[in-house]
Amino acid sequence: MLGALKWFFGLGLVAVIGISAGVYFAFFGAGPQITYVTPDLVPIDLNTAAPSDRPPVNLPTAVVLRVPFTTQAPLGNWADRQHTCEEASLLMVDRYLRGDHSTGKIDAQTADRGINQITAWKPAVDLEIHQIGAVAKKYMGWADEVMPATRLAMKQQLALGRPLIVGVRTHGLGNANYPGFRTHFEDTGWSVSHYLVVVGYDTSDSFILNDPGISKGHGWHIKYDQLMHAIDDLVHAYPNLNAGRVFLVLAPFTNSSK
C-alpha cells in the first residue's frame, strides 16, 4: 500500500468511493455522439462467494465508462515510447479508479510523469498480463483479476464499473491508422504486441477502446470477433506473452468475510 499512497500524479490523494451511476454525452471531433452510461464501481471482494461481487443478471444495453485517455507517447516522442503501452493502460485505469472521469486527454506532462513512474516499477520491458496486475496490486494498491475474455464476461465486468486491460497484436485490431497497416499488414516488426483498455460496449454490440498505441485510438469501436482475432494474433506471434483469451480487471478491494 505504500506505493499506492505515493501514487497521485496531479490528482492528489483521492479516496476511492463508488462512482455514481449516470448518463452523460460527449463528442469526439466529427465522430458520432457517445452516451456514457456509467454504473457504480463495484469493488473486488476477496471473499469470492460474496453476492456483492456478482454481475447484474440483466445487463444494460450499453455501458461506456468515463475513462480518461492518453497515448503511450503523450509528448509525441514515439521513438522512445515503443514499450509503454502497459504503462499508459495502467495510468488510464488508475486515474479512473481514483475519480478522474473527464473522458478527455490527460494533461501531457502529467501523463508522461505517470508513465515514467510505472516504467520504473516494471520488472521487465514487456509484461505478460498477470505481471501487469501484479504491478497494479503492489504499487497502486488495487485488487486484480485475470478472467476469460468471453463476450458475456467482458460485458459483466464493464457493468460492474470496471475497465478491462487486454493484450493484442496491433494490426489485428483492424484500425487502419496504425503504421504499416495498408502496406505491411500483420508483418513482423509492424504488427506488434500491445495493451489497451476496453471502456465499454454499445447497442450495436461493439466494444469501445481507449487504445494508447495511436493518437486516433480514443473511443475506437470494434466488434467482439475482431478483438478476439487481435488477441489470438498476439498469442501466435508472441508465445512468451501467451496468456490466451483473457483480460485484466482492477478495482478497489473489500473482504465481506471479515
Name what the model sees in each region.
Residues L2-H130, T170-G172, N177-F181, T203, ...:
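Active-site-adjacent structural segments surrounding the nucleophilic cysteine of cysteine proteases
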Residues W7, I34-L41, A50-P51, G174, ...:
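Noncatalytic regulatory segments and standalone regulatory/sensor domains
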Residues V64, D80, G161, S191-Y195, ...:
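Extracytoplasmic
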Residues P68, P74, G161-P163, P212:
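Proline-rich low-complexity regions
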Residues D80, D144, G217:
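Short, flexible active-site loop motifs that bind/organize anionic cofactors or intermediates
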Residues R81, E86-V93, E128-A136, T150-M154, ...:
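Stable alpha-helical elements in mature extracytoplasmic
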Residues L90-S102, N116-A120, K137-E145, A159, ...:
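Sec-exported extracytoplasmic/periplasmic mature domains
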Residues K122-Y195, V199-Y201:
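Predominantly the structural core of cysteine protease catalytic domains
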